[in-house]
Amino acid sequence: MSAHKAVCFLGSAMVTTWSSLFAPFAIASAFAAACPDVEVVFARATTEPPGVGQVGHAFVDSLRSQVRGRSVAVYPVNYPASEDFASSASVGAEDARAHVQATVTNCPNTRIVLGGYSQGALAIDLITAIPVSMAGFTPAPMAPEVANHVAAVAVFGNPLDRYVGAPLTTVSPQYAEKTADMCVTGDPICSPGSMSVPTHDEMFSDAHLSYVKSGMASQGATFAAGRI
């Protein structure tokens, strides 16, 4: 091997070696750069099309306007949102739980905001409340250490009070202080005492559909912004 070829070979080997050494750091940096400051995990209401729904959009828009300078990512919980409440909400809970755990693992510095409207609120209940089976719903509790990564929980028109006679702030010891459980006056979905599956008319009542117009979606965002 000539001296020139030897130098070229040695240089190539050194570049390869240094590249191998620094590749993991480069990959880690790329992942860190891709992690948002804040991630909203939001579950839409019954029969709304895939996405975060009308209340979710209002909530996210308001939150972004209040945390300017910070990146805000959004994850729409992937679930049927069908009128088969127990089965559908349980699927949503498992999807939300799995996504939150993945975010905590891959982006430990990201502050997570959980949210849900109507049936979507129930999906969030199932991952944050005391894990007790009720009316066919399947709890999907998050690991205790996840709570440190969750900045706030905001639920709207939450049927939990209807089913168990108490809001999420009462039945979720780990998340109570960081939770806003919002119910419009006269909303039959989140009013206590019924202990029955909401009817179609109740789900589409004027009160239950008023969370954007009433300003409660923005109020929930203000609560969340104050905890990020």
Segments (PLM) and residue ranges:
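Generic anion/oxyanion-binding catalytic loop in active/binding sites
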Residues: 21, 85, 142
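Sterically constrained small-residue positions within well-ordered secondary structures
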Residues: 23, 31-34, 68, 144, ...
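Short, charged N-terminal helix-start/capping segments
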Residues: 25-47, 85, 151-163
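Fungal secretory targeting signals
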Residues: 1-32
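Secondary-structure junction/capping motif
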Residues: 3, 13, 53-54, 137, ...
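Active-site catalytic motif of lipid deacylating hydrolases and related acyltransferases
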Residues: 33-111, 185-228
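Serine-dependent carboxylesterase/thioesterase catalytic core
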Residues: 94-115, 119-176, 180, 189
